[in-house]
UniProtKB/Swiss-Prot annotation:
UniProt-recorded Gene Ontology molecular function terms: GTP binding; GTPase activity; translation initiation factor activity
Keyword GTP-binding: yes
Family membership: Belongs to the TRAFAC class translation factor GTPase superfamily. Classic translation factor GTPase family. IF-2 subfamily.
Protein name as annotated: Translation initiation factor IF-2
Gene: infB
Length: 842
């Protein structure tokens, strides 16, 4: 191998070759100095040509010997590396080698052409003009280049542009050729065919004769760059082709899939695109063509437009009736077996009659001490265990007038009502209201006469008073059980429990257990650590952790956790069981129903349907807008804007109900926002924008929020008792009322003499009959019991002195701004005074 290397070097460097055209493989092995520094000339003798030819033959033989060794070594290394290459990389490498071979063939063709040109030129005419030779030389070079390019296109279509440019630069030969011999020079095709066969043979030998020890570092930097670019371009083309084929196959498969789309009454653009597995922008483009230009992904489409879009994308659709969906959900499980359930008992009565204390005595707890001032302001739900694994669910409702909605909610979910009446107070307004709720709900009732331990307790008086409201006790021949109890002394509590169980037995309370759960929301609130917390009572089915529930028209979610009345975590809740549920997205209203659905998608559809019904009901009950004439006729009415924040949703409803009853013709109360939770910065900013006050009931305000409210001059009022908030709202509204102004007659003047009457007014001499006259007082000029002038006393004098007032029994002179004729005999003057009366809303 070393010998072959030395032969190559000696062959390349021996002698001074002043003019030669080497093959590409020869040029790659020349040093950069020789390649760049040698200048060639065509004007040489025939002897020089022969010497050059002989040297060139030696060089070619040496180069061919060396190239065989190098090619064998390259083939070996190629085979060795091909084992670790992918098929695509091997193909790219083969293309690069083929491009290099084509370049070598081009060099050989140019060399043969150059030699022939030299011989013809030197034997014919050396003295031809330089300009003609250059012209003919360019024509010859162009034809040779065309032939080379055609040959290159026949062998491969991936020739590098850099290689072609290199060939064109090397083809700028300085030979002088006569135009008459050009056609003869380009004839020898046999030589080209032989060389092509030779290189094909060499290329085949590269694949099968691997030899080690010979370096393949025979390419210049330029050719290496060309080969690398060829490999990179081929890889890119293959990758792009692969991607395009993959995309075409994916799109073709996608277009073949036909989906069945469920279309509700209303659906958003985004939901419709998702159900069809289409892009949102494609659906928007289709709507744009239909004339819906400014439509967003969150905009709703009716079923007609949605069905047209589905058909345009070659899908099928089915219209869904959400009302039918809700009916089917509630009808689920009606044909299944009914099993006994625990009774739900609601404790009702007037405020301070001992309802919560009675429940504490039964549960052996102390809830009443936790209430502010001992007043219940929330609905509480508890379940107690009796002997024999029997359970009773109790619901404690507030007794204040403001909690009418809460009491109505309690009667809607209850089986039995325990009406608590204080033995010392007797029948009170909220007692009567509770009786009416019981009658409206058509539920059973037990009367518990509390506080019988007091000395002035009179049970017979209460029993007779109940007759006036249609409640007949068993002692009087009726069907209402009356139990005298004492929560404080724990008297007759067992008798009350037994009466409840007896009543439940008579009612034969049963429910389906093995079905989707449904029930009622008793109370709801926002907890800082847990989020939305809702107290539910299951009326049908079994509620499990992980179920998806829909509550009312604005709330749904997945049940993350459940807790019983004792605070222990529960996995399931059976009928008549109260639980606190975490996981809802919004705070539901008290008294709203809940039901378990199959999926979040179904939950959203049901919420959308209920929201639509709710909005339609609001529009139907909305008051008609007043036109400009009506507003002018009614006059300007002052408004008080309120932002209400409470601890639980039941309190929000109770306070809104109470303050809505505070009305006045000259002022209007607007509850701009009501919610559950602490006062936040957004509440303060809303109050600043709307000029509102913030009423906070049983909630706190952070220091940062207080500081912001102080900067914005926003008033935040905190309350713990519902009485206080109602009274305070009345005071605020009363302070906004303008005082009522009335005209009161404070004196009378009789006219004695008219001194003058002109443009400045009338000067009258008068006598104060009664009352008192003051300067600037309002006066009315009365003639024959008719008011002919109203004005003010501009000047008041006694004799020649200006005075501020004149009492009864004295004479005075006055100046009125009245220029018409006055008759002293019949005209009298009434002295008036405006008195303001402060109005109070009661």
């Amino acid at each position: 191998m070393n010998e072959s290397k030395s032969v190559v070097d000696s062959g390349l460097m021996s002698g001074k070759i002043e003019r030669t055209t080497l093959k590409l493989s020869d040029k790659l092995k020349l040093s950069s100095n020789i390649h760049q520094g040698t200048k060639f000339s065509l004007k040489k003798s025939v002897t020089t040509v022969e010497v050059r030819k002989s040297k060139k033959r030696k060089d070619i033989n040496n180069i061919e010997q060396a190239s065989v060794v190098l090619q064998n070594d390259n083939a070996y290394q190629d085979n060795e590396s091909n084992n670790s290459l992918t098929i695509q990389e091997q193909i790219s490498r083969m293309n690069a080698l083929q491009n290099a071979n084509i370049c070598e063939k081009k060099e050989d063709i140019k060399e043969d052409t150059s030699d022939v040109n030299l011989q013809v030129t030197e034997s014919t005419s050396v003295e031809k003009s330089e300009s003609d030779d250059v012209t003919l030389e360019e024509e010859s070079s162009k034809k040779v280049e065309e032939q080379v390019v055609e040959e290159a296109h026949d062998n491969t279509d991936t020739v590098s542009l850099n290689v072609v440019e290199n060939v064109q630069e090397e083809s700028q030969v300085d030979n002088q050729v006569e135009s008459s011999n050009i056609s003869d020079i380009l004839q020898p095709k046999g030589i080209e065919e032989k060389k092509l066969k030779k290189y094909e043979k060499e290329h085949e030998e590269k694949k099968g004769n691997p030899k080690k020890g010979v370096s393949n570092n025979m390419y210049s930097k330029h050719v290496k760059l060309v080969i690398e670019e060829e490999l990179e371009d081929n890889n890119k083309q293959v990758i792009q082709t692969h991607k395009s084929r993959k995309n075409r196959s994916t799109s073709s498969v996608k277009n073949k899939i036909t989906r069945k789309v469920l279309i509700p009454k209303k659906i958003t653009v985004q939901e419709l695109a998702s159900s069809m597995s289409e892009r949102v922008k494609d659906v928007q483009h289709m709507l744009f063509q239909m004339g819906r230009r400014d439509i967003k992904p969150t905009d709703f489409l009716d079923s007609d437009h949605a069905s047209v879009i589905v058909e345009a994308f070659n899908h099928t659709f089915k219209l869904v009736n959400d009302g039918k969906l809700e009916e089917d959900l509630y009808a689920d499980g009606n044909d299944k077996e009914l099993l006994p359930r625990a009774p739900v008992v609601t404790v009702m009565g007037h405020v301070d009659h001992g309802k919560t204390s009675l429940l504490d005595a039964i549960r052996k707890s102390n809830v009443a001490d936790g209430e502010f001032k001992g007043i219940t302001q929330h609905i509480g739900a508890y379940q107690i265990m009796l002997d024999g694994d029997k359970r009773i669910t109790f619901i404690d409702t507030p007794g204040h007038e403001a909690f009418t909605a809460m009491r109505a909610c309690g009667t809607n979910v209850t089986d039995i009502v325990v009406l608590v009446v204080a033995a010392d107070d007797g029948i009170m307004p909220q007692t009567i209201e509770s009786i009416n709720h019981v009658k409206a709900a058509n539920v059973a009732m037990i009367v518990a006469v509390n506080k019988i331990d007091k000395h002035d307790a009179n049970i017979d008086k209460i029993t007779n008073s109940l007759l006036n409201h249609g409640v007949v006790a068993e002692s009087l021949g009726g069907d209402v059980i009356v139990v005298p109890v004492s929560a404080k002394e724990r008297i007759n509590l067992d008798q009350l429990k037994s009466s409840i169980l007896l009543m439940a037995e008579l009612l034969e309370l049963k429910a389906v257990y093995d079905t989707r759960a449904s029930g009622v929301v008793i109370e709801s609130k926002v907890d800082r650590n847990c989020g939305v917390v809702a107290t539910l009572i299951v009326q049908k089915g079994t509620l499990k952790a992980g179920d998806i529930i829909v509550v009312g028209h604005n709330s749904y979610g997945k049940v993350r956790n459940m807790f019983n009345s004792d605070g222990r975590s529960e996995k399931v809740a059976i009928p008549s069981m109260p639980v606190k549920v975490l996981g809802l997205n919004n705070v539901p209203n008290s008294g709203t129903n809940f039901i378990v659905v199959d999926s979040e998608k179904q939950a959203r559809e049901l919420i959308s349907y209920r929201q639509e019904l709710f909005n339609a009901e609001l529009e139907a009950n909305a008051k008609p807008k007043m036109d400009a004439n009506s507003i002018l006729a009614c006059g300007v009415v002052d408004e008080l804007n309120v932002i209400l924040k409470c601890d639980v949703m039941g309190s929000v409803e109770a306070i809104c109900y109470s303050i809505s009853k505070i009305t006045h013709e000259d002022i209007k109360l607007n509850v701009l926002y009501k919610g559950v939770g602490n006062v936040t910065k957004s509440d303060v900013l809303l109050a600043e924008t709307s000029n509102s006050i913030i009423l906070a009931f049983n909630v706190k305000t952070d220091a940062s929020v207080k500081e912001l409210a102080k900067q914005k001059c926003i008033e935040i009022k905190h309350y713990s008792v519902i009485y206080d908030i109602i009274d305070d709202v009345k005071k605020i509204l009363s302070s906004m009322l303008k005082p009522l102004q009335q005209e009161v007659q404070v004196g009378t003047l009789s006219i004695r003499k008219v001194f003058s009457s002109g443009s400045i007014g009338s000067v009258l001499g008068c006598y104060v009959t009664n009352g008192i006259v003051r300067k600037g007082a309002l006066v009315k000029l009365i003639r024959n019991n008719n008011v002919i002038h109203e004005g003010k006393i501009k000047v008041l004098r006694r004799f020649k002195d200006d005075v501020k007032e004149v009492a009864a029994g004295f004479e005075c002179g006055i100046l009125l701004d009245y220029s018409k004729e006055i008759y002293p005999e019949s005209d009298i003057i009434h002295i008036l005074e405006i008195v303001e009366e402060i109005r109070v809303i009661k």
